[in-house]
Amino acid sequence: MRFTATVLSRVATGLALGLSMATASLAETPVEALSETVARIEEQLGARVGLSLMETGTGWSWSHREDELFLMNSTVKVPVCGAILARWDAGRLSLSDALPVRKADLVPYAPVTETRVGGNMTLDELCLAAIDMSDNVAANILIGHLGGPEAVTQFFRSVGDPTSRLDRIEPKLNDFASGDERDTTSPAAMSETLRALLLGDVLSPEARGKLAEWMRHGGVTGALLRAEAEDAWLILDKSGSGSHTRNLVAVIQPEGGAPWIATMFISDTDAEFEVRNEALKDLGRAVVAVVRE
């Protein structure tokens, strides 16, 4: 469905309620509710939804379009900083290494780095800004320090991800064109990369802890999945968006339970950001219900 300017505000405010009521009436279990939510978002937004949900203790999983390609958008900032941490583990850099922030580096959405122009930021500060506040300039500086987008793609391959690839920097990596494989991942591939970085042995325990620290604050994700989670749960997440997309990747650690990995991608839709954002909230709500069960 294409949304006109006259109905967008109504859709944005009513979508979450409509989807929640529909899933509550049609679905009997949280998994069925999740499936219904995905189907209704695809229908109402004219979108593709890719989702992978995995319980790492038992290996139980549920997915939809798990092998299809979706733009990573800002979710790529997690593996970018994973690559920084891998080099830290190897002794090739220090997180206290400082890089300059130049006026020429500025691109749209730089809430942290725009206040540091003319100065330096450490790699630690840049990764926190890139992940927690989704600062695009911080991400570009980090990508450049690694050797460019191709170095990030090589890092994906080194952790066993044959699918994900980075071809451009911010903001061009968000440009959507149907069928374009640049700057894409799949829900399944990103789930495995998150597992490798945060739960596997790709990084040292110290590096895994640092990545978790950068991801735990929810600077730009507070109203998404983590808003539905229990207070005692640990949520490590990163969101992303473009003109036709809205994404979230997360590790969910329930109190006393095994970690879950959730990757959610909404794409190929002309709906405005507010509509896509409400749809992502609905996906997060449905995922949390499955985890809580």
Curated annotation (Swiss-Prot):
Decide whether keyword Signal is in the record. yes
Tell me the domain of life.
Bacteria
Which miscellaneous remark does the UniProt record hold? The class A beta-lactamase family has a specific amino-acid numbering system, sometimes called Ambler or ABL numbering and often misspelt as Amber. A multiple sequence alignment was used to derive a consensus sequence and then the consensus was numbered taking into account insertions and deletions. This allows use of identical numbers, e.g. for active site residues, despite differences in protein length. UniProt always uses natural numbering of residues, hence there appear to be differences in numbering between this entry and some papers.
> Would you tell me the protein name for this molecule?
Beta-lactamase
**Which major enzyme category is it?**
hydrolase
Task: Report the EC code(s) recorded for this entry.
Answer: 3.5.2.6
Keyword annotations of the record? Antibiotic resistance, Hydrolase, Periplasm, Signal
- Write out the GO cellular component annotations: periplasmic space
Just give the chief location class: periplasm
Subcellular location as annotated: Periplasm
Which GO biological process entries does UniProt record here? beta-lactam antibiotic catabolic process; response to antibiotic
Q: Which residues bind substrate?
A: 238-240
UniProt lists the family membership as follows: Belongs to the class-A beta-lactamase family.
Q: Name the catalytic site residues.
A: 74
The entry's function note states: Hydrolyzes beta-lactams antibiotics. Rates of hydrolysis relative to benzylpenicillin =100: ampicillin = 27, carbenicillin = 25, cloxacillin = 0, cephaloridine = 4.
Q: Output the Gene Ontology terms for molecular function.
A: beta-lactamase activity
* Record InterPro entries: Beta-lactam/transpept-like, Beta-lactam_cat, Beta-lactam_class-A, Beta-lactam_class-A_AS
List the signal peptide residues.
1-27
Known catalytic reactions: a beta-lactam + H2O = a substituted beta-amino acid
Q: Is Hydrolase among the key words of this record?
A: yes
